UniProtKB/Swiss-Prot annotation:
<dbReference type="InterPro" id="IPR045913">
    <property type="entry name" value="TBC20/Gyp8-like"/>
</dbReference>
<dbReference type="GO" id="GO:0070309">
    <property type="term" value="P:lens fiber cell morphogenesis"/>
</dbReference>
<dbReference type="GO" id="GO:0031965">
    <property type="term" value="C:nuclear membrane"/>
</dbReference>
<dbReference type="GO" id="GO:0005096">
    <property type="term" value="F:GTPase activator activity"/>
</dbReference>
<dbReference type="GO" id="GO:0046726">
    <property type="term" value="P:positive regulation by virus of viral protein levels in host cell"/>
</dbReference>
<dbReference type="GO" id="GO:0005783">
    <property type="term" value="C:endoplasmic reticulum"/>
</dbReference>
<dbReference type="GO" id="GO:0019068">
    <property type="term" value="P:virion assembly"/>
</dbReference>
<feature type="transmembrane region" description="Helical">
    <location>
        <begin position="238"/>
        <end position="258"/>
    </location>
</feature>
<dbReference type="GO" id="GO:0006888">
    <property type="term" value="P:endoplasmic reticulum to Golgi vesicle-mediated transport"/>
</dbReference>
<dbReference type="GO" id="GO:0044829">
    <property type="term" value="P:positive regulation by host of viral genome replication"/>
</dbReference>
<keyword id="KW-1133">Transmembrane helix</keyword>
<keyword id="KW-0472">Membrane</keyword>
<dbReference type="GO" id="GO:0031267">
    <property type="term" value="F:small GTPase binding"/>
</dbReference>
<dbReference type="GO" id="GO:0007030">
    <property type="term" value="P:Golgi organization"/>
</dbReference>
<feature type="site" description="Glutamine finger">
    <location>
        <position position="144"/>
    </location>
</feature>
<comment type="subunit">
    <text>(Microbial infection) Directly interacts with the N-terminal amphipathic helix of hepatitis C virus (HCV) NS5A.</text>
</comment>
<dbReference type="GO" id="GO:0001675">
    <property type="term" value="P:acrosome assembly"/>
</dbReference>
Amino acid sequence: MALRSAQGDGPTSGHWDGGAEKADFNAKRKKKVAEIHQALNSDPTDVAALRRMAISEGGLLTDEIRRKVWPKLLNVNANDPPPISGKNLRQMSKDYQQVLLDVRRSLRRFPPGMPEEQREGLQEELIDIILLILERNPQLHYYQGYHDIVVTFLLVVGERLATSLVEKLSTHHLRDFMDPTMDNTKHILNYLMPIIDQVNPELHDFMQSAEVGTIFALSWLITWFGHVLSDFRHVVRLYDFFLACHPLMPIYFAAVIVLYREQEVLDCDCDMASVHHLLSQIPQDLPYETLISRAGDLFVQFPPSELAREAAAQQQAERTAASTFKDFELASAQQRPDMVLRQRFRGLLRPEDRTKDVLTKPRTNRFVKLAVMGLTVALGAAALAVVKSALEWAPKFQLQLFP
């Protein structure tokens, strides 16, 4: 049985064969927990293995494990978080009133049935975390939706560690969203349609004809889907995945959701209002593990460096997320490029088809081709290539991601 059931990924296929299937599931889960702890206890910590565990089916399994692994994925010292002093910043912060309004509207982000007093206390902590990070990093600008990311970390790791983790995240993965303008955010959204075009040109052309644009995916991207998913288990599963990957992985996941809903989109009236309304409502019963696997495959087959020219709408002076990610990876333990893994992925294609299938754009459905290639079966070479790819492609990112 797949590990996904522990993450609320929906019922698995087939029926229980006595206790055999349950025993198999428990054995896989126990094995994965042991592998995670082995990586944590290695000297130095085997961060590459932790990234693979975070990406692979089931993710990091429990919040207890996340409290240990998330700091490693972000290269944060969990034993020395910064002091909390956000309460002293409320009167002087220009963002306080907006943060307060957003936090007050965040009731549904807290577990149902949580005592009101406890929830109100957490909301106060949420405000303090945000204001402290903004005070310590004046180059960062608050945006509506930022609190949706912060509250996820708060609920999993607590106030003190959440401050350290979100601060690191804000200066790396989220950096483009925290510019004074939305130019870089819009540029990242511009990757969505080229990804869809590579996989399903028919769907791409339909959406272009409808002139739906990409604004429907804005809240997905800037909140890491925290604002639009009602089941907290799905949210933290995606955070496992995104924390282990390149900063642009959320836009690949957004593309995979659209591709998964292909028939619904094509059955819509071909107009902006109809398609936007459909896509802005994310189904809550998505096959998350399958979509995570496919997003990883697409990142490997169509890396950002190959899509940058299409995605670029105008010359970008800032290349913050891509350039800082290289420095971030260099600072993380056990992060080395692995050409063998990339070659293993390319070995899945016949030599005469490599250039034709990866770099050209035949008007066929590549989503089906990915499944046929078998890349999503166990996330093996593709997952490894995803976690190792950032350094290998870093020079291209710096030159081409924001051309």
